Structure formats: structure tokens, C-alpha cells
């Protein structure tokens, strides 16, 4: 790329061979030959790219030329993508082939400049030295370094990007004029940025653009660089050494340069396509996140100062035997680890190695660990000696058959008893009963152990789906059997088959009307593929523990059916029934909230029993039509009569107070509105967009920000971070207020017009 620092990146027209035809401009000649490569939707953007390539700006670099070719290739129909080539016959040679594979335009870069050939014409450009340009440019050195570069950058913009580049330049000018240290260029749709930005800028924010690369010669004194949610495929090795914090999450980066900024302390590369890390990462690095990439191995020696390492969701089969000695947080879940290093860092506080294939843990773990997650592995035992500082341990979904003998005597150093979660493991009934007995004793002071009810040692054979359905619909015709047999190829059909068999063993089958209810529901599923898909998904984890989890899953399926009916128009002509359906969903959400409160206060109870217990016991008092009558383990739910009385009162009060606002924002009601009042809906949405796009939204955000009076901190970066967090939170709040106002207004108008507004009055007396 042309180096602005030493040789100014401008060019001059040097020679022309074969006079240009005055009849048809080159860009039109080329376009006439390749217009068929592009759909009507992409024609304008493709034409702009061709115009650029036929007459590149003076500051054109190989990277910029390549980006235009990449853009054309992306816009073209797949059948013509290979007619647009770059790096052809060399890193800096680009060309376009006609439909019959004849070269009609080429651009070749060399050390002296570049040559454009097309339509029998050849134009060569050479670079101009900085002194040559300076002699012809008016203004100060600042004008050359900034205004000239920025104006050329704006001129190069594709049509749809030009206005946003102008906006970016205005922001840079504002920073330059007012000596601001933060430059925010996010959500502008930028495909490039100028290499030169105001030198006082220390924080550069480029999030949510369309950048495919960063400048090779990015200048300035940047300390913080954010370029999340772009289309970056690589990182230049020449980024300023001043950078201390860099976030490049949600891009397409495949590899890192061997050299990163030497001052780098924090690097976040979440959700990219990186397969390996450089051996020599910056020694100043303290925070490293490569969560959700494709990394197979880590460097043997990571920087010794790293305190937080996140390598979650990669393809690691092992961790380095020697990890940074000061490491406090290690997140390595969702990999293919089979073991951990024999010796872990002595100051480790958080260790997450969930969703791996680990069969055994080190017998001695660092005593400083407060949070340990080893769930979803292949462990058969837990260590006898747990870390002294342990506050919570998640070991669900392993192959544990016993608990450490020392567990009841473990005393953690924390203010609360340690919580050890071992749900969905194949414990024997004796192990569960012994743990229950120990924890129920008056003088027990050990950890709180939580596991799911039910016998995990029983292996249930999953029948073909059509056979499971026949258990409920005994009079099925052969045609119906074949229909359900065809459904067996659908995703999660086997899970639903197992669910149906298990449902037949629940307490609810004692009631004849329950079987009729399920039979009618199954006939509905046979006719509705979308509802069937939703129900099959819910069935995925329905049979992993006890009978009551199956019943709870059935409740969730009935709730999903109710919502599905509302969204698909079943209540469009029956708004009274829709409002009653909404009231039931509201009550169920309130029950879930209260159940979560109860679970937090319990010592040793399966949360399934608490959730189902409230639903089951409040079925009649709250008129819950989708709930079943019975459950098996209510006696161990920990729910008291006073809990039920309090829950009933709180839910009824909440419904009288809040249902009006809740219903206005309910998604299924919005679907109904779009169908029964399309004009009013469009007007309301237009009004909502206007609130956001005009000054009203930002003015309200600014007013609340000003009321907060965020004090200046001695740490300017910290003040900026607090300011940004506050602005984000206020923006969400203002948006929720706008939604509530507009959706409530349209709801009241439509219900009044339909003469059912009285149904929104307080329900409970």
C-alpha cells in the first residue's frame, strides 16, 4: 500500500497509449459487456464499482482496488463470480472477464504505480512524492494530512456510502477542532476508513460497519480500538503500538499477525474464524478472549500477566501444561478437552470447563476457586478435597454415581453454604436418600446439594413415533398411521415419541378426560407442521429426569399451542377469547416468577417440583385451563399453604394492576392487530419510526443523561465507559416507554372500536 508517512499516496497520469474513444466511455463499454452478471437489485452498486475501477482515484491502493473487485464478485450471480478475479497471476493483479472469458478490464500494480487496461486503452499512473504534492497543495500541513486525505476518501465512496463518509469527516473535524479524544464512527455502513485520523484521538469506535480491513498504515495515538460487527478478515501487523485495548468481535478474521501492538493489554476476538494464535503474544496482555472460534491448540507459553482467559467454544483437545501464574478466570467450555493440567494456577478463582469430554479432575484444585463448572462432561467421581473458597459447583449431566464421602463435612469459606448442583446424573436411590437424610438433620452445616428427582438408572426404550401415538389414538386408520410414520423423519420426533410414552405413565392418566384432551391435541398436531415443530423442540429434554418434568413439559406445550393459535388468527374474530388467553399466559408468567423466588430460598428441592407445584395447586383458583390436575412429587416441593395463599393474592393484584400494559406489548396480540387493523398498525409503526428518527428520541436520552450528572473521573477512559453504559441503558428505557405509549394507544382504540374495551377492566374483585 502507498505509505502516506514517507511518500504521499497520490498519483499522476503518466502515459496513455491508443487515444480514448470519444464515442463510448470505457465504463459504459465495460458495463454493456457485463451488466447481465448482476440482478436488477444490484445493478446500481455494480455500476458504481465499474466507474471507480475504470477511473481509479489518485490515492487508489491495491487494498482498495481489491475491495471493489470483492464487492463486484459478491454482487454477481454465482455463475459469473469467477469472471471477476483478483490476485490473478500475482498478489496485485486484478481483472474482469466477459461472458466468453475474454479479458475486458485489468489493473496491475507494481513498485512504480499501477496500470489500467480496457477497451484497447492503457492508462499508467505513478506515485508523487510528498514534496511534489506539498508544492501544489495550498494550506497548512494539517490540511494536507487531514482535509486533503479526507476529501479524497469521500470522493472514492460508493453512492450509497457517500453521505455517511461526509458525516464521518464532520465528526473527525469536530474532534480536530475541539481536541476530543474519542472518535465514534459506528453504524455508518463504512467499507473503509482513512489511514489518518486526528492525532489526539485515543479511542476509536468503528462498531457495526462493513469494514473488510483496517488501514495498513493507521496513524495516530490510539489506545482503544473497537471494530466489532464488521467484515474484517485479517488484522494488519502494523497497527500502532499505542493500542492497549482492542475489540474485534463478530468478524471473519481467520488468522492473527505474528506481531500485535506491544502495549496491548486487552484483546477480544469473540466469534471469528481463527484457527491458531501467534506464539508470541504481547507480554503486556492481561485479558484475552477468543470465544467461539476454531482454535485447535494454544501456544505453549502464554503471556505471564494474563488474568482472564476465555477460549470457550473452540476445538481444543488440551490446555497448555503451564498456564499464566496469575490467571484468575479460565473459561474453556465447549471444547474437546479430555483432561486438565495436573497443576492449575494457584490464584485461580473461576474455572469453567463445561461441555467437554473430561473423565477425571485433578485431585487437588487451587484453594482459591469460588466458581467451578464441570457440567456436561464424562466425570464418574468428584475430588474428595474441594477448594476451600468454593461457593458454587455445577456438575450436572455427567456420569456421577456417587458423591465424595467427605462432602457432608465440607465447610466453605464463603458467607453462605456452598451450592453443589449434580442434576441429571445416574445416582443410586441409596445415594440420594442418604444425602436427603444428612441434609435434613438439624445440625447439618455442609453444602447444599441439588439434584433432580427420579430414578436415572432406568433406561426407557424409545418406540417409533407412530406406535407411541397409537397408544393414545387407538382407532387410527392405516392412512393416519402412515402419516405419523412419515413424521418420524422430522427433527426431534424421537424425543416426542419418548415424551408421549412417559406422559402415559403420569398421575394425570387417572382422569379419563385427560386422555381425550391429549388425543384431540395429537390430531391437531398432525395437521399443523409449524405447531408440531415447536412441540417437538419442547420435547427434547422432557424425559431426562422425573415424571413431573414430563408433566411440566406438557404444560409448556399447551402454553405454546395457545400462543400459536393467537399468532395464526384463531382469535381474530373472537377478541374476548384472545384476551382470556392472554390473561392465562400472564398468570403463568407470574407463577414462574414466584416459583423462582421460592427456589432461591429452598435448601434441597428440585426446581421442577416447585414450578409444577405452583401451577398444579393454583389451577382452579386462577382458572388455568392448560394445566393438568396432578403431579407425583408435590410433597417434596417445599410449597406451603401460606405460599399458595400469598401467590394467589400477589398474582391477582398484579393482573389487575399490570395486565393492561402487558397485553399491549404481547407479541400474539400484535400479530392479530396487523390482520384486523392493518391501516392503524402501519400508522402506529410509522409514528414509532418517526419518534426514533427525529430529535425526540435523542433529546429525551440527552435530557436524562444530563439529569444523571455523571461526575468527571480522574480516569478519563473510565468516565467515557460510564457515560456510554448510561446512554445505552437510558436508550433502552426510552425505547420501552415509547413502545408502551404507542402500543397501549392503538390497543385502546381498537378494543373500543370493536366494543370489547370493558374486558380490560380489573378481572379480580
Swiss-Prot record:
Residue ranges, annotated region (E3 ubiquitin-protein ligase catalytic domain): 462-765
GO terms for biological process, alphabetical: negative regulation of protein binding; protein secretion by the type III secretion system; protein ubiquitination
SUPFAM superfamilies: L domain-like
Record region (Linker): 452-461
Keywords noted in UniProt: Host cytoplasm, Leucine-rich repeat, Repeat, Secreted, Transferase, Ubl conjugation, Ubl conjugation pathway, Virulence
Domain NEL: 464-758
Active site: 546
GO molecular function: ubiquitin-protein transferase activity; unfolded protein binding
Ranges: LRR repeats: 200-219, 221-242, 243-262, 263-284, 285-305, 306-325, 326-346, 347-368, 369-389, 390-410
Cellular component, GO annotation: extracellular region; host cell cytoplasm; host cell endoplasmic reticulum
Regulation: Binding to TXN is inhibited by hydrogen peroxide in vitro.
Annotated spans, Interaction with target proteins: 1-451
Top EC class of this enzyme: transferase
Pfam short name (any one): NEL
Keyword field contains ATP-binding: no
EC code(s) of this entry: 2.3.2.27
Subcellular location field: Secreted; Host cytoplasm
Role played: Effector proteins function to alter host cell physiology and promote bacterial survival in host tissues. This protein is an E3 ubiquitin ligase that interferes with host's ubiquitination pathway. Can ubiquitinate both ubiquitin and host TXN (thioredoxin). Leads to significant decrease of thioredoxin activity and increase of host cell death.
Quaternary structure, from the entry: Interacts with host TXN.
PANTHER family for this protein: OLIGODENDROCYTE-MYELIN GLYCOPROTEIN (PTHR47114:SF2), PTHR47114
NCBIfam families per record: PRK15370.1 (NF011897)
UniProt remark on domains: The LRR (leucine-rich repeat) domain forms a slightly curved solenoid and may mediate interaction with target proteins.
Family under the similarity heading: Belongs to the LRR-containing bacterial E3 ligase family.
Protein name per the record: E3 ubiquitin-protein ligase SlrP
Amino acid at each position: 500500500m502507498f505509505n502516506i508517512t514517507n511518500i504521499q499516496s497520490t498519483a499522476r497520469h503518466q502515459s496513455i497509449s491508443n487515444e480514448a474513444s470519444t464515442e463510448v466511455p470505457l465504463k459504459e463499454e465495460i458495463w454493456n459487456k457485463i451488466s447481465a452478471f448482476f440482478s436488477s437489485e444490484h445493478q446500481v452498486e455494480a455500476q458504481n464499482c465499474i466507474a471507480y475501477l475504470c477511473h481509479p482515484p489518485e490515492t487508489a491502493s491495491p487494498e482498495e482496488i481489491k475491495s471493489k473487485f470483492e464487492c463486484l464478485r459478491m454482487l454477481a450471480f454465482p455463475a459469473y463470480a469467477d469472471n471477476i478475479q483478483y490476485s490473478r497471476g500475482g498478489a496485485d493483479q486484478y481483472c474482469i472477464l466477459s461472458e466468453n472469458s475474454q479479458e475486458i478490464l485489468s489493473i496491475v500494480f507494481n513498485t512504480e504505480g499501477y496500470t489500467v487496461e480496457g477497451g484497447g486503452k492503457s492508462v499508467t499512473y505513478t506515485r508523487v512524492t510528498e514534496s511534489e504534492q506539498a508544492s501544489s497543495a495550498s494550506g497548512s500541513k494539517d490540511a494536507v494530512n487531514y482535509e486533503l486525505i479526507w476529501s479524497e476518501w469521500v470522493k472514492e465512496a460508493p453512492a450509497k456510502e457517500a453521505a455517511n463518509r461526509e458525516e464521518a469527516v464532520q465528526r473527525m473535524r469536530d474532534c480536530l477542532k475541539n481536541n476530543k479524544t474519542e472518535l465514534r464512527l459506528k453504524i455508518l455502513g463504512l467499507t473503509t476508513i482513512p489511514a489518518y485520523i486526528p492525532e489526539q484521538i485515543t479511542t476509536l469506535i468503528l462498531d457495526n460497519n462493513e469494514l473488510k480491513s483496517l488501514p495498513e498504515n493507521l496513524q495516530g495515538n490510539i489506545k482503544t480500538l473497537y471494530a466489532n460487527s464488521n467484515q474484517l478478515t485479517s488484522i494488519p501487523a502494523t497497527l500502532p503500538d499505542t493500542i492497549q485495548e482492542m475489540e474485534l468481535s463478530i468478524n471473519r478474521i481467520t488468522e492473527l499477525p505474528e506481531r500485535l501492538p506491544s502495549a496491548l493489554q486487552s484483546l477480544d476476538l469473540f466469534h471469528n474464524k481463527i484457527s491458531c494464535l501467534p506464539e508470541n503474544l504481547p507480554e503486556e496482555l492481561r485479558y484475552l478472549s477468543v470465544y467461539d472460534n476454531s482454535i485447535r491448540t494454544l501456544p505453549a507459553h502464554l503471556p505471564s500477566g494474563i488474568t482472564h482467559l476465555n477460549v470457550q467454544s473452540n476445538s481444543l483437545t488440551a490446555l497448555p501444561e503451564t498456564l499464566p501464574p496469575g490467571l484468575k478466570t479460565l473459561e474453556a467450555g465447549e471444547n474437546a478437552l479430555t483432561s486438565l493440567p495436573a497443576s492449575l494456577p494457584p490464584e485461580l478463582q473461576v474455572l469453567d470447563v463445561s461441555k467437554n469430554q473430561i473423565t477425571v479432575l485433578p485431585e487437588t484444585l487451587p484453594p482459591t476457586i469460588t466458581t467451578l463448572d464441570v457440567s456436561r462432561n464424562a466425570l464418574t467421581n468428584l475430588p474428595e478435597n474441594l477448594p476451600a473458597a468454593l461457593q458454587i459447583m455445577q456438575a450436572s449431566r455427567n456420569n456421577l454415581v456417587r458423591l465424595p464421602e467427605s462432602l457432608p463435612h465440607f465447610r466453605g469459606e464463603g458467607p453462605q453454604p456452598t451450592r453443589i448442583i449434580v442434576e441429571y446424573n445416574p445416582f443410586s436411590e441409596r445415594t440420594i436418600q442418604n444425602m436427603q437424610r444428612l441434609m435434613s438433620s438439624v445440625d447439618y452445616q455442609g453444602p447444599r446439594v441439588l439434584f433432580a428427582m427420579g430414578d436415572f438408572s432406568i433406561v426407557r426404550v424409545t418406540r417409533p413415533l407412530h406406535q407411541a401415538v397409537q397408544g393414545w389414538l387407538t382407532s387410527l386408520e392405516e392412512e393416519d398411521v402412515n402419516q405419523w410414520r412419515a413424521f418420524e423423519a422430522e427433527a426431534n420426533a424421537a424425543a416426542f415419541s419418548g415424551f408421549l410414552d412417559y406422559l402415559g405413565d403420569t398421575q394425570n392418566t387417572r382422569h379419563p378426560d385427560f386422555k381425550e384432551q391429549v388425543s384431540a391435541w395429537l390430531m391437531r398436531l398432525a395437521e399443523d407442521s409449524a405447531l408440531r415443530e415447536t412441540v417437538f423442540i419442547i420435547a427434547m429434554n422432557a424425559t431426562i429426569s422425573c415424571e413431573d418434568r414430563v408433566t411440566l413439559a406438557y404444560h409448556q406445550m399447551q402454553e405454546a399451542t395457545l400462543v400459536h393459535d393467537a399468532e395464526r388468527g384463531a382469535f381474530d374474530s373472537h377478541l374476548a377469547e384472545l384476551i382470556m388467553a392472554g390473561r392465562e399466559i400472564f398468570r403463568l408468567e407470574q407463577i414462574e416468577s414466584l416459583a423462582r423466588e421460592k427456589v432461591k430460598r429452598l435448601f434441597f428441592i428440585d426446581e421442577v417440583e416447585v414450578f409444577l407445584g405452583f401451577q398444579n395447586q393454583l389451577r382452579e383458583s386462577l382458572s388455568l385451563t392448560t394445566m393438568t390436575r396432578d403431579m407425583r412429587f408435590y410433597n417434596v416441593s417445599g410449597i406451603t399453604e401460606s405460599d399458595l395463599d400469598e401467590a394467589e393474592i400477589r398474582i391477582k393484584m398484579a393482573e389487575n394492576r399490570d395486565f393492561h400494559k402487558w397485553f399491549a406489548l404481547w407479541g400474539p396480540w400484535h400479530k392479530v392487530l396487523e390482520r384486523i387493523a392493518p391501516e392503524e398498525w402501519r400508522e402506529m409503526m410509522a409514528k414509532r419510526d418517526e419518534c426514533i428518527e427525529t430529535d425526540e428520541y435523542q433529546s429525551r436520552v440527552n435530557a436524562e443523561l444530563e439529569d444523571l450528572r455523571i461526575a468527571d473521573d480522574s480516569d478519563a477512559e473510565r468516565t467515557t465507559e460510564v457515560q456510554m453504559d448510561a446512554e445505552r441503558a437510558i436508550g433502552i428505557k426510552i425505547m420501552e416507554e415509547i413502545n408502551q405509549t404507542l402500543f397501549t394507544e392503538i390497543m385502546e382504540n381498537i378494543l373500543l372500536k370493536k366494543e370489547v374495551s370493558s374486558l380490560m377492566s380489573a378481572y379480580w374483585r
